[in-house]
Amino acid sequence: MTRKTRIQTIESAEPEVDENGYDRPSKSQLKREMHELQELGAALIALPKDALKRMPMPEKLDDAVREARRITDHEGKRRQVQYVGRVMRSLLDEETAALRTALDTYNGVNKAETAKLHWIERTREKLLADDAALTDFIRQHPNADPQQGRTLIRNARKEAQQSKPPRYFRELFQWIKNADGPPAQTDSEADDAQDDEDDDRDA
């Protein structure tokens, strides 16, 4: 007696393809991309005015973003932000990529500026707390005027003790900020420079 073998059909796990034979993106992928474009549009709306001018936006997107910034009504703004997202989805891939690059560049510069401001604030606190900190600072920033630094530190301490407006406290911040210059040469670098100078004279 022969036994019949039951053949079960197995659903294909391969991704769907369109009429041209290309893989269709999954629904979850499409949803994720829509969300990312919506976030990109929201980031553009939140940019400062001067930064927004540097963004490579097509005219339609530029108009939509500026309108969203102008609207103050909560519900009206929400609808406009959604519209910005729809405009974002109509952009070419290269247009979206250019916007991401410009935003990444802006955010990178912004982070660097913030980090520098924090460094200036920490340096000011060190200078006000420890006299030896000025010597270290001058060694690392040879372009800074040490006499001006001492005067600002002394006056900033005095105005703090007397509860006066922080005029010299702010001026000390600017002095530190403007002190950047070429780093001081190490001993070996100085020796190399002297050797080069001697060689030039002997030539």
From Swiss-Prot:
MF terms in GO: ribosome binding; rRNA binding
Biased composition (Basic and acidic residues): 21-31
UniProt-annotated location(s): Cytoplasm
GO cellular component: cytosol
Entries under Pfam families matching the protein: DarP
Highest taxon of source: Bacteria
Region (Disordered): 1-31, 178-203
Compositional bias (Acidic residues): 188-203
InterPro entries: DarP, DarP_sf
Sorted UniProt keywords: Cytoplasm, Ribosome biogenesis, RNA-binding, rRNA-binding
Coiled-coil segments: none
GO biological process: assembly of large subunit precursor of preribosome
Family: Belongs to the DarP family.
HAMAP family assigned: DarP (MF_00765)
NCBIfam families tied to this protein: PRK05255.1-1 (NF003593)
PANTHER family: UPF0307 PROTEIN YJGA
General function of this protein: Member of a network of 50S ribosomal subunit biogenesis factors which assembles along the 30S-50S interface, preventing incorrect 23S rRNA structures from forming. Promotes peptidyl transferase center (PTC) maturation.
Protein name (database record): Dual-action ribosomal maturation protein DarP
Organism: Paraburkholderia xenovorans (strain LB400)
